[in-house]
Amino acid sequence: MAEAEGVPTTPGPASGSTFRGRRDVSGSWERDQQVEAAQRALVEVLGPYEPLLSRVQAALVWERPARSALWCLGLNAAFWFFALTSLRLVFLLAFGLMIIVCIDQWKNKIWPEIKVPRPDALDNESWGFVHPRLLSVPELCHHVAEVWVSGTIFIRNVLLFKKQNPGKFCLLSCGILTFLAVLGRYVPGLLLSYLMLVTVMMWPLAVYHRLWDRAYVRLKPALQRLDFSVRGYMMSKQRERQLRRRALHPERAMDNHSDSEEELAAFCPQLDDSTVARELAITDSEHSDAEVSCTDNGTFNLSRGQTPLTEGSEDLDGHSDPEESFARDLPDFPSINMDPAGLDDEDDTSIGMPSLMYRSPPGAEEPQAPPASRDEAALPELLLGALPVGSNLTSNLASLVSQGMIQLALSGASQPGPSGAPAQRATRGFLRSPSSDLDTDAEGDDFELLDQSELSQLDPASSRSH
């Protein structure tokens, strides 16, 4: 609506950032176009001189040390000749340009007309000079074009800066020119020219062989030691200042020292030497005072140097034989062998729960009572007999009651009728001792206690068999 009425609108921050991004993209695209144009122009000019440029690069990077040394000596001789000669500069410049023009005419105009062409010249026209580590003409022209475009952009920015800020440009240019004037006043121009020549000659060599990286790797330990030495020097200076302040103000230093000692004493409690020696003298088989007090309070204690996970470490160390250690730990595993009294019950759902200890004394006769009433009457005695001595009644009562009820229910469900012998076998099967769970195949001489009625039933069968 505002645009339709002709009211100018100010762009927001989002639109401003978008505009700057578009301007940066357009500027980079224009720069790439300029670089490509300059590269094409340089390739057209330097294309015929590719072998010569390759030889110059090989000489600058010292691929062939003999030729490179000759080139270096020739350049040094030419430089010092022009520097120390009594001839005029204009004469030398004109004479040098005349020699260059003659060589160019001979190589490009006269020699191609009088030389005999080779038979494979047409085949070699499509091939170019390739070196694995030297720059080809297109690559060299690309780098030169980037430098040229960067220089032109810099000059353009300087001219724009001069137009927008003439005062700042005047101060900046005067400062730079003053520095160059002082440098030229104290350093001869001949030496500066020679340094520039040596830099141009040695720079490709340093880049080609990565001398800067190698020098940094060699100097890195020394620089690190220098850094540490500087830090140590600063720390020593700080300590000297502190000592000087303490010497000038001893009362303040004593107050600070006492305060620091009190603070450290608060964090470091004092220990009695006799108590420490007595605690250190306690062996693994003895008990300390703290352990005895814990025992008096009714809680369990652990000997020094033992934990619930490492309480049996001495026993494990004593049994190095794997078979012996396996046989020793075998009673801890539940047995898979069923009691002979419980073989007739196929649905044994005890699921490996610890069975209750119940053994009738030898010679005692069991009263002929119904199985259910006899089991119910024996339940309290079983629970009290199976209760471990010295254990906590409250913690074990729930588990014992639940186990007894499950066993009674299973024994009641497994008996089919009023017959007493199968019910007694089932009850004894479910109320067997833990020692019966440890029977193996080798221990096949198991026995069970039978009533007098059972013995009378078995006697006629044995007499008939005999």
UniProtKB/Swiss-Prot annotation:
N-acetylalanine: residues carrying this PTM: A2
InterPro entries, per the entry: RETR3_RHD, RETREG1/3
Lumenal side: 102-163, 208-381
Protein's cellular compartments: Endoplasmic reticulum membrane
UniProt short sequence motif LIR motif, positions renumbered to this chain: 445-450
Family statement drawn from the similarity comment of this UniProt entry: Belongs to the RETREG family.
PANTHER family from the UniProt entry: RETICULON-LIKE PROTEIN, RETICULOPHAGY REGULATOR 3
Descriptive protein name: Reticulophagy regulator 3
Gene: RETREG3
